[in-house]
Amino acid sequence: EGDAGTGMVATNSVAKRTGNISAGTSIFAMVVLEKELSKVYPQIDLVTTPDGALVGMVHCNNCTSDINAWVNLFREFGEMYGLTFDMNDLFTKLYSVALKGDPDCGGLLSYCYFSGEHMTGFEEGRPLFVRSPESKFNLANFMRANLYASLEVLKVGMDILLKEEKVAVDEILGHGGLFKTKGVGQSILAAALDTPVSVMETAGEGGAWGIALLASYMNNKAEDEALDDYLDAKVFAGQKGTKMDPDPKDVEGYNAFIERFKKTLPIMKAATETMK
């Protein structure tokens, strides 16, 4: 899994008690473990850092594809009125409005299942948006629900590591497209995992940046210099980034959302069985 190692390097999360999350069209989290897990979990893959430390990985097939589809729908609406958009600006505005939504998304629910998810037992998926007549249906809650949904399956897997296995993580580093809009994906991830999340200036660089750093390490390291020491001293020293602690209200709101998601998974089952 080449992307795993390069993602760890790109976020300087190769030391124990660190973790990183790569979030784009798919999403995966990697946490460097202090010890082996107590048992085998089908939902958790075990990999290693480039220098051999044990890592628990949670991989999910879906993340931002459904959000991208909705943003394109808004673009088409604007174009009917003769408007043209810079897509980065459109994403920024729509992501940012999510921060004005209710912590629990006003009762809205989204499933971003473009494909199946082994984490929740689905071989195929159907993107769905669901609300009740009493739900608070507005743009802020709508965008917030879709951003929450991008992390919903990851949350199920990470709860195994953080809650069942009591894995210690001091900080999660985020990178990938979900984090390009400053403070939005970061704050929602912090709420979902109830863990501090940092995003560096290189957050949008992803695996290619990690590959370059590994090549630099192999070419320029001092004798017996460990990878984490090299990254700390020669790459990320002075690197600007932002750290965000979870907001307790958002944590409570995300927990309400994820319980609603798990309780209503039969909706997804019915959709995959009947919508062929």
Model-inferred region functions:
Residues 1-173, 178-276:
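Active-site core segments that coordinate phosphate-bearing ligands/cofactors
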